[in-house]
């Protein structure tokens, strides 16, 4: 079991982390998104940590904080970055909560180049191969994901089977309050960095 969560506000993000940490205490990742045009032009930065008591530091330039807490996978019990979330490929990033049931079939069917034995590692190569909508509709099993395309500065969240809630601007695998509403299965919410809300929805058939 794992958990995903995100917020623009560091205080809220820390609270979401505390709530979600019960879903995974093996390794955590903190991913920060930055605007374009900065001197070093770094758009995404991720820290992987196993010290769950360490304070999550604020970065004044971060425009969105994304998190993932992970339990050991069924096949991997040691910490390795290549088997930890988020996975990344060609400036695209994804963190996944759940278990895919058809990842081995997808690897064979689409001749995907997978670097690890973790089921989540199939998602980005599949998106690269057949496109986002077709890839998501092809997945079977359970998943709640955040996905960021740094090439287009586009943040998306979606789920099928796994829990995922949002209050409009923040999201979490755990419903931390009544303000957080269940995200409809088969819907993909797209974040608007201007008004700081997930206010665009597309439907993907399952």
What are the language-model segments listed below?
Residues 1-206:
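N-terminal segments that mediate ammonia production and transfer
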């Amino acid at each position: 079991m794992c958990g995903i969560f995100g917020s623009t506000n560091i205080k809220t993000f820390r609270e979401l982390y505390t709530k979600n940490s019960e879903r995974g205490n093996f390794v955590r990742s903190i991913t920060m998104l930055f605007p374009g045009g900065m001197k070093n032009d770094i758009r995404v930065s991720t820290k992987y940590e196993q010290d769950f008591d360490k304070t999550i530091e604020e970065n004044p330039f971060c425009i969105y904080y994304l998190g993932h807490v992970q339990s050991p996978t069924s096949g991997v019990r040691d910490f390795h970055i290549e088997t930890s979330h988020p996975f990344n490929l060609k400036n695209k990033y994804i963190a996944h909560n759940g278990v895919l049931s058809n990842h081995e079939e997808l690897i064979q069917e689409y001749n995907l180049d997978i670097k690890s034995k973790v089921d989540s590692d199939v998602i980005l190569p599949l998106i690269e191969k057949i496109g986002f909508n077709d890839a998501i509709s092809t997945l079977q099993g359970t998943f709640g994901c955040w996905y960021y395309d740094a090439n287009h500065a586009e943040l998306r969240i979606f789920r099928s089977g796994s829990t995922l809630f949002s209050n409009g601007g923040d999201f979490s695998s755990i419903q931390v309050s009544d303000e957080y509403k269940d995200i409809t299965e088969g819907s993909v919410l797209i974040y608007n960095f201007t008004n700081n809300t997930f206010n665009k929805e597309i439907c993907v058939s399952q």
